[in-house]
Amino acid sequence: MKNLQASVRDRLLNIAQETNRPFSEILQYYGIERFLYRFGCSKYADKFVLKGALMFTVWQVSERRTTLDIDFLANYNNQVATIEKVIKQICKVPVTPDGLTFDAETVKGQKIKEEMEYEGVRVKFIGLLGRSRIPMQIDVGFGDVVYPRPKIIDYPVILDFPKPHLKGYSPESIVSEKFEAMVKLGLLNSRMKDFYDIWLMMRQFNFNGLHLVEALKRTFKRRKTTLPEDRPFFAEEIYDEKSDRQTLWRAFLRKGDIKIAPERLSDTARKIEEFLMEPLDAIKSNYEFHKVWKKSGVWSTPPGVSL
């Protein structure tokens, strides 16, 4: 086991040097990857859906932001003790040796409440690669609906160990949930990552208009939030270049070493409006939205479709 741990550590160090990333970040991603593998091998794999920024890794999105935790949607009991028990059992799932152990004795959960109607659960625990400690965090949400339905994904691996195999979120529902949170929070919105993630996704994906409209409708209905009908979608501070939100945006870009995004939050917000205005008009007017979003930046009508 010690030889394996040393070998894994050396290979991770090489990756850190080759990619010019901190070793701690590469180690964290390895811990996330191998824990997801254990999750996929467990009896709970069908009850949890991977969401959040880790899906950008699944989709191999370039310029994705760094994330150091795991987000799940669970079709499961939302009691802290119950989720703690699940995580403890997954820590002990027998797998092909990969140099890692997860200490079930360190598992500790607490309730969280963000934009969801139902309380979520945050669980922290420790992974170990030899003497190197990996602080793990999992946020579990409840009560949301995913459209289109979750698909089985193969999570990319850093080293040549088996890939995690589990359920993953749809791009449409990720956009819908982030947009709903941005609308609901209004003046309180300090979640710059949501602006960036939607802006990034609209540049990386083609979207089926019918699917995006349905995802928006279901998410806003489930969370009991009113869909915006007109521009501007967001609080006026988002568009004010002298507001503290602009300061937050610049700090977010600087911390994440993000160089491709607009320098001004207002420009990002207006791009998102261009992306979502037509789907929202379709919902407001109750007509079927057959257009397709091209990642080049326009909604277009597919050949053979008459509107």
Question: Where on the chain are the PLM-derived regions?
Answer:
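Structured mid-to-C-terminal alpha-helical surface segments
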Residues: 1-48, 58-66, 70, 74-307
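Glycine-rich beta-strand-to-loop/alpha-helix junction loops that act as flexible
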Residues: 50-54
